[in-house]
Amino acid sequence: MPLRLDIKRKLTARSDRVKSVDLHPTEPWMLASLYNGSVCVWNHETQTLVKTFEVCDLPVRAAKFVARKNWVVTGADDMQIRVFNYNTLERVHMFEAHSDYIRCIAVHPTQPFILTSSDDMLIKLWDWDKKWSCSQVFEGHTHYVMQIVINPKDNNQFASASLDRTIKVWQLGSSSPNFTLEGHEKGVNCIDYYSGGDKPYLISGADDRLVKIWDYQNKTCVQTLEGHAQNVSCASFHPELPIIITGSEDGTVRIWHSSTYRLESTLNYGMERVWCVASLRGSNNVALGYDEGSIIVKLGREEPAMSMDANGKIIWAKHSEVQQANLKAMGDAEIKDGERLPLAVKDMGSCEIYPQTIQHNPNGRFVVVCGDGEYIIYTAMALRNKSFGSAQEFAWAHDSSEYAIRESNSIVKIFKNFKEKKSFKPDFGAESIYGGFLLGVRSVNGLAFYDWDNTELIRRIEIQPKHIFWSDSGELVCIATEESFFILKYLSEKVLAVQETHEGVTEDGIEDAFEVLGEIQEIVKTGLWVGDCFIYTSSVNRLNYYVGGEIVTIAHLDRTMYLLGYIPKDNRLYLGDKELNIVSYSLLVSVLEYQTAVMRRDFSMADKVLPTIPKEQRTRVAHFLEKQGFKQQALTVSTDPEHRFELALQLGELKIAYQLAVEAESEQKWKQLAELAISKCQFGLAQECLHHAQDYGGLLLLATASGNANMVNKLAEGAERDGKNNVAFMSYFLQGKVDACLELLIRTGRLPEAAFLARTYLPSQVSRVVKLWRENLSKVNQKAAESLADPTEYENLFPGLKEAFVVEEWVKETHAELWPAKQYPLVTPNEERNVMEEAKGFQPSRSTAQQELDGKPASPTPVIVASHTANKEEKSLLELEVDLDNLELVDIDTTDINLDEDILDD
């Protein structure tokens, strides 16, 4: 089949005329030497200019990377060779190499040598380990030596192209050429070796507009390629693909098949004359140099021609050589996820065509090799030719004995047991075909599915697929497009019913043939089904699987990998890369079987599979169950305490949540469980949870809401002990234990608040608190401390104090016992009461009232003296006036001080 050369431009770098290009073997860099004397390094992944070397003012006709030394070596029209370190941009060395323009540089792949050619008709060998001494001079050409290239299969041999119309092949160590190839009518500009092991070929391009292929063993021209309209300036065998790339001063780059010599493609990017080309082993990138800049294009698919059967036998093609490896041969060797497998490779022979794709049939007995417009079906064991033919595309059916080929853009043929069974023309043409349970045909109008047996249209879908993957059962299918993928269910029973009755058939087929299960916005590169689980590699190099609407990431890949298959008995998934390295990742078949059973709602089967799932994998399964809505089963399966606790909360399983909270000893969990217990009216459990969580605020809310005075009392003591002073204060206050509130404020140094509390609720304690406040404040501000008026000394500043003593005593006697919460509706709210009025007529006991009036305290705390002589009162007033006159009031709020009217008048 024709080469499917997807050609994508990766970089366009506008610049002055480009005389040579090179690609770095490990970095994403392109080197371009310019006619204006500069050398540039471009990053073709980021499309940015990363380095520039100002070499000289004359054209730089040659530049090469020496990656093992971190060098760029340049040759210019000033006859100088310059060596730069491309990391530091420092010039490492410079010397005069020739007596005329330097045309080409070739770097030896293993030795510390470079070869240079020049218009002085000489080729020179330089050894950088010997201080860049000239080790050898090769004489023989009679005109400019335009290019030299080292033989990749024999590093001691190189070839040269000259304007004397000849190609000479040389040996290192010999000053005269081995032989000369003649055939061009004009000067030869370029030359290259074929790197494959099957052909001893050279290619050359000349000013006679021809490209010639030479057999350098027989010293004959085997092919001449015609097509360019001007001088051929560059020609190259691609090191990976079966193609020849030629560039000309006519502005075109032509791509030829290296086996058939058929012209496959012509590129013209409108950048004037083409001067140079560069490619790299292991890469599909090709660099091109033009008059107006340089371009990098990516040719073809990087996906390797590789396939694996269900038993672990892998077949791949390395160029035209077919090789095999068997995973069984590894035995019980330990395999680590993502590591390259040490496989023993066996040569199976060469293929008559260049393989672009290799694919086993479903039962693994046969393998088809496609390429060059042909297909060959071999036996998988011995690679014996079973069948062959011409085709643009090939697809296996679900039935191993059946397959289809796309003969042209309008004809599809179906074969059974290697014999043609049916040929048909799809209504809207055939741009591509897809195998599987149904035959898929893509056209400009969309995708059409046909029955393999009778080619009846099953369903037409307006979609442009890239890949189609069928499950083994034929129930599920994944259709992958350029931007997303769809999971569909094939309703075969409905299709059979319609085929029998022919009812409900439209021009687009059977409407109910498929049911859409989901669309995922992710690009699928390669994929396969295991049960009802779709495993795939994505465009961002993730290895995922999709089941039941959930995407699970198995691994993050460090490079592009291609799925080969899954072997259930190994519980491993196998992938390969473009270098034909095989890696694997663990994926338990029991997990996939369980998820498949759940998706089919076959819980009896799921219960049978569950014991085979290792404990470390059960939490993953539980998350899957949760997402499917089976939270009760997820709670049973999960082994992660965090996950189980969350599920228990969601399901209201108090006992399980309590056990998990006890094991975890987490305050957060106790709080969450307390909320659940309150919502379930389990107040005893809620109290215990809040206690474990040390949530005193929550306990206070619970205690007050339930009217539990004993709980409030214990909470007050506990909160005070643990330093939760706000909760302790509120707990004491709610119980009417104002004296305890006061002592708490004093102990915590909140003396101003204590003074106001005492003035409001415990006037008998005001004097003591003010004294403590004054002592404390004097350490900071003596004047502010002196401004505090003690009620024992300035009784006139505290009107109603005597009555307050009486009210305090009345409150103590009448509110000694707490009222039951059930009497709350009968109690007058505090804001509606006048305690002074209620206490009228109350006579405090003699022992207390008389002591207060006589100035003798009833308790160790000081109280205000009830009466003073007139002289003492007058003296006190005078002293206060003097104090007030001498006091600077700084940040003192006097708005709440009640002064007597006569003092205000004075």
Curated annotation (Swiss-Prot):
Residues 866-890 form a coiled coil. It is a peripheral membrane protein. It is found in: Cytoplasm, Cytosol; Golgi apparatus membrane; Cytoplasmic vesicle, COPI-coated vesicle membrane. The modification Phosphoserine is found at residue 859. It comes from the Eukaryota. One of its GO terms (molecular function) is structural molecule activity. InterPro entries: Beta-prop_COPA/B_2nd, Coatomer_complex_subunit, COPB2, G-protein_beta_WD-40_rep, TPR_COPA_B, WD40/YVTN_repeat-like_dom_sf, WD40_repeat_dom_sf, WD40_rpt. Pfam families: B-prop_COPA_B_2nd, TPR_COPA_B, WD40. The modification Phosphothreonine is found at residue 861. GO terms for cellular component: COPI vesicle coat; cytosol; Golgi membrane. The modification N6-acetyllysine is found at residue 627. SMART domains: WD40. Its main location: cytoplasm. GO terms for biological process: endoplasmic reticulum to Golgi vesicle-mediated transport; intra-Golgi vesicle-mediated transport; intracellular protein transport; retrograde vesicle-mediated transport, Golgi to endoplasmic reticulum. WD repeats lie at residues 13-52, 55-94, 97-136, 140-180, 183-224, 227-266, 350-388, 390-425, 746-783. Keywords: Acetylation, Coiled coil, Cytoplasm, Cytoplasmic vesicle, ER-Golgi transport, Golgi apparatus, Membrane, Phosphoprotein, Protein transport, Repeat, Transport, WD repeat. PROSITE patterns: WD_REPEATS_2, WD_REPEATS_REGION. Residues 837-863 are annotated as: Disordered. The coatomer is a cytosolic protein complex that binds to dilysine motifs and reversibly associates with Golgi non-clathrin-coated vesicles, which further mediate biosynthetic protein transport from the ER, via the Golgi up to the trans Golgi network. Coatomer complex is required for budding from Golgi membranes, and is essential for the retrograde Golgi-to-ER transport of dilysine-tagged proteins. Oligomeric complex that consists of at least the alpha, beta, beta', gamma, delta, epsilon and zeta subunits. Probably interacts with PEX11A. Interacts with SCYL1. Interacts with JAGN1. Belongs to the WD repeat COPB2 family. This is Coatomer subunit beta'. It comes from Pongo abelii (Sumatran orangutan). The lineage of its organism: Eukaryota, Metazoa, Chordata, Craniata, Vertebrata.
